[in-house]
Amino acid sequence: GSANKEVDCEAIVHFAGRHDEVFRELKGKLNLKWDLESDEMKLLRVDGSFRVVYSSIGQFVDVTHSSLGDVPEFTEQFYRGQDHWTGRLEMLTGIDVGGWQGVAVADINNDGKDDMYVAQPGGLPNRLYIRKGDGTFEDRSVASGTNFLDSCHGNLFVDLDNDGDQDLISGVLDGIIIMDNDGEGNFTKRASMILPAAVPYSISAADYDVDGDLDFYVCCYNKRPGVNRHHLFARPVPYHDANNGGRNALFRNDGN
């Protein structure tokens, strides 16, 4: 006859859900023994333990409408779908179905509450929303001078001049824009730099030369010239040893 074919295995179990305003999470580990000799698998043994956690909190609640629903600049721009804008704006402005726009968060007017800045595709203005005391927001994109119409993917708030407020570095289609904050959320252009090699997508900051001010590093994506330039992906699309991306850029801050 055939040899006995028994197999031991371990199963990790994790269930989570909400019912009657209570969040329940069940975690456990099961030890199983199966008989594989017959035509159908037979479970010979199961043992293990479970842990159940109950909580009245534990999930995020969508408050987009309650915090931004009364802001006309928000509803008119963000409540419309992608098809609405791609069907009305020229691709030459920089709009694309690919997206990849990010959100930057910082206290830009020094009132102790975080505000948010939303990058937008070309042809649509970036939006700066100031958080008020009741949890709602007001649009200050135009008043702050940050309503760029250039295609934008990434932004970073960082104190570049060590004056105690959050300045803005914005990565737009052609390069970067550096904006000085007056401490009350009003921005003035300090500098702009073209990035000829590639389009900027994200920005990070650190004092890499340990001179007391923050430098910044710009991560880029598609190369600009030649056949590799494309709105969505570089060509070809390698799955390993990728070397067809755009060149990143490191900027040293000399305090001026």
Summary of predicted features, one role per range:
Residues G1-N256:
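Beta-propeller-forming repeat regions
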